[in-house]
């Protein structure tokens, strides 16, 4: 969020700045305060394509405790009452626009230049970006304060990316073994692994690596979000189809289609792909 603007309209009362969390009610009150404070475009449900689509899934799933798939990763569950309520609420909230002209990267640009006051497509790479101003500031110098997605339960579930190494089996055992040796050095050598993680600009998956960002204020603060990482549902069959169906569904809602109808089409098509 643009914390400078949030404080300007007195909405920082809805934010737990220690935990970087807020309730769904607090989120909606913050949007309302910004909208009534003269900021017509508070946030966008961007849906021009799949870029940054993890953000729109996360805001919708978190608001009322919905999920994107079942726990076994066999089917898509976006048609739950919780998800339908979230989509309808976002659609009906003044200041939040379903925008089929932008994807995640465009939303980030609009947030940085002050057009939007919130961004759903956000991660540590954006927080640390210093292309147009110092890290943690908008182009105009406003404070960017990272937030977990709003929830009713107080237990946000963030969409994280799991990055690692892979080896292609090209039939050459010597090359395969060399690749294993290299990966082991990069990811497990006690003298190298810290530098490897630092070079990635992200976080280690093993606690044994230690607190490598102790001297970096932004990274240390952002490490609080690691505890909020949710299910890695991207392994569900039919994933490529589901991603396309998702932003198409959001476009239809933004164009006025009934939410339940739009969501049913998404689930029918995504689950057909999952079962194929």
Task: Give the residues covered by each predicted segment.
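Periplasmic solute-binding protein
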Residues: 1-16, 28, 47-72, 154, ...
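Short, solvent-exposed loop/beta-turn-alpha elements that line the ligand-binding surface or hinge
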Residues: 16-20, 43-45, 66-85, 133-138, ...
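Short helix-initiation/N-cap motifs at beta->coil->alpha
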Residues: 20-26, 99-113
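Glycine-centered hinge/linker elements that transmit conformational signals in sensory
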Residues: 28-35, 72-102
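Bilobed periplasmic-binding protein-like "clamshell/Venus-flytrap" ligand-binding domains
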Residues: 36-50, 188-199, 273-276
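Extracytoplasmic/periplasmic substrate-recognition and gating elements
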Residues: 88, 93-96, 134-201
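Conserved C-terminal helix/tail region of periplasmic/extracytoplasmic solute-binding proteins
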Residues: 191, 203-205, 210, 223-276
């Amino acid at each position: 969020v643009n914390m400078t603007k949030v404080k300007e309209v007195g909405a920082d009362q809805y934010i737990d700045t220690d935990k970087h969390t807020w309730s769904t009610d607090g989120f909606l009150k913050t949007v309302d305060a910004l909208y009534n404070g003269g900021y017509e475009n508070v946030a966008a449900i961007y849906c021009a394509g799949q870029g940054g689509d993890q953000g729109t899934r996360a805001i919708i799933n978190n608001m009322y405790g919905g999920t994107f798939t079942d726990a076994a990763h066999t089917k898509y569950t976006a048609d739950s009452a919780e998800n339908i309520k979230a989509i309808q609420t976002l659609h009906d909230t003044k200041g939040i626009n379903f925008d089929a002209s932008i994807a995640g990267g465009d939303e980030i640009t609009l947030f940085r230049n002050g057009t939007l006051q919130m961004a759903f497509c956000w991660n540590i790479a954006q927080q640390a970006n210093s292309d147009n101003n110092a890290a943690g500031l908008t182009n105009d110098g406003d404070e960017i304060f990272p937030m977990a997605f709003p929830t009713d339960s107080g237990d946000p579930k963030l969409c994280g990316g799991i990055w690692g190494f892979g080896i292609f089996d090209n039939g050459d055992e010597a090359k395969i073994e060399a690749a294993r040796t290299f990966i082991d050095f990069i990811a497990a050598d006690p003298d190298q692994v810290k530098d490897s993680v630092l070079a990635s600009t992200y976080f280690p998956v093993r606690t044994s690596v230690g607190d490598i960002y102790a001297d970096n204020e932004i990274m240390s603060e952002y490490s609080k979000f690691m505890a909020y990482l949710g299910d890695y549902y991207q392994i569900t069959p039919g994933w490529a189809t589901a991603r396309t169906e998702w932003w198409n569904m959001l476009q239809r809602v933004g164009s006025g289609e009934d939410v339940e109808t739009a969501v049913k089409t998404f689930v029918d098509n995504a689950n057909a792909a999952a079962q194929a």
